[in-house]
């Protein structure tokens, strides 16, 4: 009987620079899902790859004095090397410069053109080269005005400058499919995850009216040519999104993989591109009469204390640095444990070192070390066979093991990786406590308690085996080391089925003579400093004091220029050497911003985290006490007391307040 299939994809990454830990986070999460599903018995196909066309690649190659493909080959080699270091278990790596992809894109474009879903027109709009995205005037951040007319601004996705572009372009008729898309959302409520993303797509993009999408360019030539009009190259989203089916052989002479694995079970990506995957991609598939994927999951951003981590800001963490110095398992564990999948998380060197020392070295490493040492000390290395529970502590422990396995599966099915790991670590903590409760060193002094002592050792080793099995999707080395040191060689004891019931070690086993540390402890001060040094940007901005614009009376026309959006405060801290300023990070959905606010005398930083506030987003950036401030949080003032203007939590981040 054929196995049930499971098809998972990451976004294809844009190789205009070295990938950072945010890319590693997405791809590791996909790998965790793939490994878990394989353990469940699924026939898994895991796809990742690179999006290699566009103006930015062309410019990067020219600047490097290379052809586009020479530049790309070097970049892709680095990406594949990183995926190798992370031991990503992808089954395919798609490059959009491959013939197998190009031919499919060209066929799809001509088909959509022939059936009237694509038409030729002229486009004028604000274009960001790094984002490869057009924006309307209302979407621009920090618009520049001259005589009441917008003459520039920044991308809402990245903050890069935009330029006004006017050129002949083919358009994809998105609006034609609006009703059908909304109907699909209603019939498939789990399609967009987390659920808040669905509300954002509907309220921020669909309800205001979908605009037809420019799908070709003539102002550069590094891309896939439109066969019927070769002066046009296919624009990014029809090119990039099609990789999910071109990699399976759709429209090729051999489409067996497409028939076997499509529709995809899940597309995972960072939240800034969820609208392309939940609006454009479904509509494109509808136009092609292809079944839609089962789920689109948008995870949050990895933030620094000073805002979003990105290549353009120069505040990135290189995953190679972490892997090379601390090992793969420590890196994978931190990413999946510290950062809740679906929400934003903050990377800190302190957090990385603490997780490695406390969770891995102390809790897990010491449990394995202590147990193997006791089996060697009290039984000359030969673990007695499991005989069943001997007292209430054993029964409680066995029940917790079964409950842990059940909860773990629930967490994994919900893609709550950090919660799944927390569940495992509660079991690790309980097992460590079991040692203290049973006091093997006391039992060993009484020959009449030899059987009871053996029973304790059997429970400890069985617990460790269960822990190692549960960790297999996350850690690629430690579970193997644990099995090796316990001298457990039967392959069936590595699998999920073996932990559905407690007590699989029914025969004596001889553990290793001397346990080897799985996770050595780190010198916290040294390693925190090392990570911080590796994160330093190439260029530090000089601290320059700038004042915010002075107050003035305005009329209604001027007020209309003010852009106010809903945002959630995600981090706050006191500005050093200032008794009135807080440095605050806010989530505006499409971006994170840093705002310096003079509310320190009225609020403690921890008191405002999680508050929904109103933010003026189109103020010119300023610096206060050397800290960049990118907006203003609205507050009310009475008798010298400031109170933040709070908004209902139901208002989505990024919603415009009028």
From Swiss-Prot:
It catalyses: tRNA(Met) + L-methionine + ATP = L-methionyl-tRNA(Met) + AMP + diphosphate. It is found in: Cytoplasm. Its main location: cytoplasm. It holds the Pfam family Anticodon_3. A motif ('HIGH' region) lies at residues 13-23. Its EC number is 6.1.1.10. GO terms for molecular function: ATP binding; methionine-tRNA ligase activity; tRNA binding. Keywords: Aminoacyl-tRNA synthetase, ATP-binding, Cytoplasm, Ligase, Nucleotide-binding, Protein biosynthesis, RNA-binding, tRNA-binding. GO terms for biological process: methionyl-tRNA aminoacylation. It comes from the Bacteria. SUPFAM superfamilies: Anticodon-binding domain of a subclass of class I aminoacyl-tRNA synthetases (SSF47323), Nucleic acid-binding proteins (SSF50249), Nucleotidylyl transferase (SSF52374). Residues 558-658 form the tRNA-binding domain. InterPro entries: aa-tRNA-synth_I_CS, Anticodon_Met, Met-tRNA-synth_bsu_C, Met-tRNA_synth, Met-tRNA_synth_2, Methionyl/Leucyl_tRNA_Synth, MetRS_core, NA-bd_OB-fold. GO terms for cellular component: cytoplasm. A motif ('KMSKS' region) lies at residues 308-312. ATP binds at residue 311. Belongs to the class-I aminoacyl-tRNA synthetase family. MetG type 2B subfamily. Is required not only for elongation of protein synthesis but also for the initiation of all mRNA translation through initiator tRNA(fMet) aminoacylation. Homodimer. This is Methionine--tRNA ligase. It comes from Staphylococcus saprophyticus subsp. saprophyticus (strain ATCC 15305 / DSM 20229 / NCIMB 8711 / NCTC 7292 / S-41).
């Amino acid at each position: 009987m054929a196995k049930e299939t499971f098809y998972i994809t990451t976004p294809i990454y844009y190789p205009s620079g070295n990938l950072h830990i945010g890319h590693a986070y997405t791809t590791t999460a996909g790998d965790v899902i793939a490994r878990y599903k394989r353990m469940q018995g699924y026939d898994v196909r895991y796809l990742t790859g690179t999006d290699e066309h566009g103006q930015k690649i062309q410019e990067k190659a020219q600047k490097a004095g290379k052809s586009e493909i020479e530049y790309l080959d070097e970049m892709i080699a680095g990406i594949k090397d990183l995926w190798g270091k992370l031991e990503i278990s992808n089954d395919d790596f798609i490059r959009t410069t491959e013939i197998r992809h190009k031919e499919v894109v060209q066929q799809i474009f001509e088909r959509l053109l022939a059936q009237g879903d694509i038409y030729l027109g002229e486009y004028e709009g604000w274009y960001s080269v790094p984002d490869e995205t057009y924006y309307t005037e209302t979407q621009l951040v920090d618009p520049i005005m001259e005589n009441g007319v917008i003459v520039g601004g920044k991308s809402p996705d990245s903050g890069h400058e935009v330029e006004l572009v006017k050129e002949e372009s083919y358009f994809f008729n998105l609006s034609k499919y609006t009703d059908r898309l909304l109907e699909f959302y209603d019939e498939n409520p789990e399609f967009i995850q987390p659920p808040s993303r669905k509300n954002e797509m509907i309220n921020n993009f669909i309800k205001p009216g979908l605009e037809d999408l420019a799908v070709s360019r003539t102002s550069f030539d590094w891309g896939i040519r439109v066969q019927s009009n070769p002066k046009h190259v296919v624009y990014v989203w029809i090119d990039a999104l099609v990789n999910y089916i071109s990699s399976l052989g759709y429209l090729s002479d051999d489409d067996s993989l497409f028939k076997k694995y499509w529709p995809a079970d899940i597309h995972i990506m960072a939240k800034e591109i969820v609208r392309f995957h939940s609006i454009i991609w479904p509509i494109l598939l509808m136009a092609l009469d292809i079944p839609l994927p089962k789920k689109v999951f948008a995870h949050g951003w990895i933030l620094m204390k000073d805002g979003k981590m990105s290549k353009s800001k120069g505040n990135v963490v290189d995953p190679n640095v972490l892997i090379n110095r601390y090992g793969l398992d420590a890196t994978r564990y931190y990413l999946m444990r510290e950062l809740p999948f679906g929400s934003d998380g903050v990377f800190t060197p302190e957090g990385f070192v603490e997780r490695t020392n406390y969770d891995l070295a102390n809790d897990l490493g010491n449990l394995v070390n202590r147990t193997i040492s006791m089996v060697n000390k009290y039984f000359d290395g030969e673990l007695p066979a499991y005989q069943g529970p001997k007292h209430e502590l054993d029964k409680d422990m066995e029940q917790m093991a079964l409950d842990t396995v059940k909860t773990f599966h629930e967490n994994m099915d919900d893609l709550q990786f950090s919660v799944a790991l927390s569940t495992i670590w509660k079991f690790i903590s309980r097992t460590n406590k079991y040692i203290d409760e049973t006091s093997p060193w006391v039992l060993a002094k009484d020959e009449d308690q030899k059987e009871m002592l053996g029973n304790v050792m059997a429970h400890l080793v069985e617990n460790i085996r269960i822990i190692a099995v549960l960790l297999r999707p996350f850690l690629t080395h430690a579970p193997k080391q644990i099995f090796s040191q316990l001298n457990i060689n039967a392959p069936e004891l590595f699998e999920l089925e073996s932990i559905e019931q407690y007590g699989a070690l029914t025969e004596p086993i001889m553990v290793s003579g001397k346990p080897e540390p799985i996770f050595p402890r780190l010198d916290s001060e040294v390693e925190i400093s090392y990570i911080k040094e590796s994160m330093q940007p190439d260029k530090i901005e000089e601290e320059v004091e700038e004042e915010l614009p002075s107050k003035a009376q305005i009329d209604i026309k001027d007020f209309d220029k003010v852009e106010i959006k809903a945002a959630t405060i995600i981090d706050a801290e006191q500005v050093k050497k200032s008794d009135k300023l807080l440095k605050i990070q806010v989530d505006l959905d499409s971006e994170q911003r840093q705002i310096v606010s003079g509310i320190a005398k009225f609020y403690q930083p921890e008191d405002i985290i999680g508050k929904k506030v109103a933010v003026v987003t189109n103020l010119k950036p300023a610096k206060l006490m050397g800290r960049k401030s990118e907006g203003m949080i609205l507050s009310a003032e009475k008798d010298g007391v400031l109170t933040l203007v709070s908004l209902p939590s139901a208002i989505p981040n990024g919603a415009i307040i009028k």
